[in-house]
Amino acid sequence: MEKNQFDQPVNVLPTPPFKGDHVGSLLRPERLKQARLQRQNGEITAEQLRNVEDEEIIRAVEKQKQAGLQAVTDGEFRRSWWHFDFLEQLDGVEAYVPESGIQFHGTKTKARGIKITGKVNFSEHPMVEDYKFLHNIAGDHTAKMTIPSPNMLYFRGKLEYSPYEDQEVFFADLTTAYKKAIQTFYDAGCRYLQLDDTSWSLFFSEDGRARIRENGQDPDELSRFFARCINESIADKPDDLIITMHICRGNYQSTWAASGGYDAVSEVIFGGLDVDGLFLEYDDDRSGGFEPLRFVNRSDLQIVLGLVTSKHGNLEDKQLIKKRIEQAAEYVDKNQLCLSPQCGFASTEEGNLLTEEEQWAKLKHIINIADEVWHS
């Protein structure tokens, strides 16, 4: 197999997702954390902070290439949260400080929220320039952009705009905004876009489904609405743009927010979404088994198995990972399967509880396993 200059396997497929891939976010280097704190305290300018971000992103991209990854991201180094930073910059959306943070297993995040105060739209968005920077340094690798799913605005946004009490009015504006976003990133050169989505975790447990009912909604109807929102948002995407979705149960400082398998919404997720690939959590028992994959009904849908955890630094047993891939292949053609971490390494700027060295070792481990499974 072809090797790159760092003597790592070059993991090449015609289009992403790649056989060895990753979700996107990376641990923030200490220098970057310090610079963000200095900016917050007024000790450096926005331009000085951006210069630090640029330098650390360049370094992170090179490290991704060294690990053998074909897709590279900016590590979400310019964000403090994986979703709020993007959603706040949509027209009609504002940041606010709620009474408390988001509840995770044994802990809470810092308090931060978003509210919908006007007509939602996508116009001038700073992350377009962020993508252009990544695109320009990606070289012969694929620059991957990650943004929150449109469902996340519905899921996390506090509604303060009365016309959106009509769900269909909200749906029309939200999907139109995302169509504009997708086209704008495409025009900037993006050919690999990932929608990150934790809203699906509501359906994975009876507790979550009960919460939906308590809110006066029917879980089955809501899941179909979420699917329709995704499908309408990406309906006009260019043919050569790959759009994947990462489905997450929460990832904050190595903790989680939800549990349960994909069973209750497996037909909707695996048989009803028009995305090109699905990044799925499968790193522990909270994610259930592979049986729901039997509802995959398209030969062109790539299933990226998140069998390697980003929550701790211990490397998984290679043979066990290979065995689990074979188990998943009982339900989906092995050529439709890929391998990745179950989530990013830093969904918020605090990051998970492992070192940068352990993070890079995890990514190299994924590439090595993928190379042996699909290319040996």
Q: What residue ranges belong to the model's regions?
A:
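Domain-level signal for soluble alpha/beta catalytic cores
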Residues: 1-376
